């Protein structure tokens, strides 16, 4: 049992908040296995019901960053990631957008996990697409160098999360960890597109990013979704060293067809994988348009284009030139090669075990 966590719980119950340093220590206790499941559940739900403060989230993120397994990434690598837990049921838009951005020539270190509160997390859909999700630091760095894309499966790079994972799954609702994942990319990306589904949290999240420091980050939000939507409810917070600026994003003004979030509904990982394949194959419609919009944000935050209009055009050209499909083929080949290598190692190990003494 952690005394620090117990003291933090008393503070929260009394209506108080944790300072940055206090939050850093508390999350360190959690990550190091010092908190009991009951303490962790109480902490997460107390914060969820009250709302996490900027200092609390920044302190938690710093503790997690101190314990992450680092990945060497090319200069200019970015991440596109949502906090999840928005309940919208859309297909994996940020994952599809990340593939398009990588296909356009911007390295993407995609940090994510399996589904906690939805049917399909980024790991689930990439696995269904035949893309490798079991990278370690060495293979992830190699994939970023060779293909321009690597998926960083959170449990592989945040081993300390094993102490929190079971409790998080049992709770089954959005917690502070949904917000912390995007803030703790193992590649240390300083340019990111971070999606937040909760309108009340989006501005606060931008403040957290600014507090932690960033070269350039976009915090994006739509009506109930953690992506830029097609219903003209999009909001984008530009976060940089000098502060935060807020911008409305109107899909209709960018030449995209307005539609409701319901038309972007997803399903299982297999169903969402087919939806992403359709986008990469160039199928027209709402799914393509929402991927173009969110990929445009990624290209803009990377400095590859000058504005969202240019990003939409670049993303469309990337898809229509077959570059998205080509990247998918390379990533699938990488997965097959890794699977063969793993099978060979297992066979060799079995042979050694079965050899006579």
Label the predicted regions:
Residues 13, 44-48, 79-84, 298-301:
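Short glycine-rich or small-residue beta-strand-to-loop segments that form or flank ligand, phosphate
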Residues 44, 91-147:
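A glycine-rich phosphate/pyrophosphate-binding beta-strand-loop-alpha-helix module
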Residues 3-4, 11, 18, 66-69, ...:
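Glycine-rich anion-binding loops and their surrounding alpha/beta cores
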Residues 2-14, 79-83, 109:
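N-terminal small/glycine-rich loop or linker at the start of catalytic domains
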Residues 1-3, 10-56, 62-73, 290:
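N-terminal glycine-rich anion-binding loops that anchor highly charged ligand groups
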Residues 82-87, 112-118, 157, 223-225:
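Acidic, glycine-rich active-site loops and adjacent beta-strand->loop/helix elements
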Residues 51-112:
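Active-site cofactor/substrate anionic-group-binding motifs, chiefly glycine-
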């Amino acid at each position: 049992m952690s005394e620090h966590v117990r003291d933090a719980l008393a503070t929260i119950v009394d209506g108080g908040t944790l300072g940055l340093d206090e939050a850093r220590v508390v999350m360190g206790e959690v990550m190091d296995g010092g908190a009991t499941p009951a303490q962790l559940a109480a902490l997460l739900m107390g914060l969820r019901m009250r709302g996490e403060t900027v200092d609390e989230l920044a302190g938690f993120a710093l503790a997690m960053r101190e314990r992450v397994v680092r990945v060497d990434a090319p200069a200019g690598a970015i991440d596109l990631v949502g906090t999840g837990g928005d309940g919208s049921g859309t297909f994996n838009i940020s994952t599809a957008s990340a593939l398009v951005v990588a296909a356009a020539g911007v390295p993407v270190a995609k940090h994510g996990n399996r589904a906690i509160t939805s049917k399909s997390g980024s790991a689930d859909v990439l696995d269904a697409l035949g893309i490798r999700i079991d990278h370690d630091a060495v293979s992830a760095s190699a994939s970023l160098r060779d293909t321009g894309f690597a998926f960083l499966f959170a449990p592989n790079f945040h081993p300390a999360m094993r102490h929190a994972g079971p409790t998080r799954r049992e709770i089954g609702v959005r917690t502070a960890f949904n917000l912390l994942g995007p803030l703790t990319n193992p590649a240390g990306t300083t340019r990111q597109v971070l999606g937040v589904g909760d309108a009340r949290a989006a501005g606060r999240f931008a403040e957290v990013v600014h507090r932690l420091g960033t070269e350039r980050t976009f915090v994006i939000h739509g009506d109930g979704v953690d992506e830029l939507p097609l219903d003209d409810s999009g909001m984008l917070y530009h976060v940089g060293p000098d502060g935060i600026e807020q911008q409305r994003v109107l899909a209709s003004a960018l030449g995209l067809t307005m539609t409701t979030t319901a038309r972007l509904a997803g399903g299982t990982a297999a169903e969402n994988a087919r939806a992403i394949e359709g986008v990469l194959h160039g199928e027209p419609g709402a799914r393509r348009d929402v991927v173009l919009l969110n990929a445009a944000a990624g290209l803009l935050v990377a400095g590859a284009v000058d504005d969202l209009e240019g990003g939409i055009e670049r993303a469309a050209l990337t898809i229509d030139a077959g570059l998205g499909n080509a990247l998918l083929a390379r990533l699938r080949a990488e997965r097959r090669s890794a699977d063969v290598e793993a099978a060979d190692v297992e066979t060799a190990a079995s042979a050694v075990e079965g050899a006579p003494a």
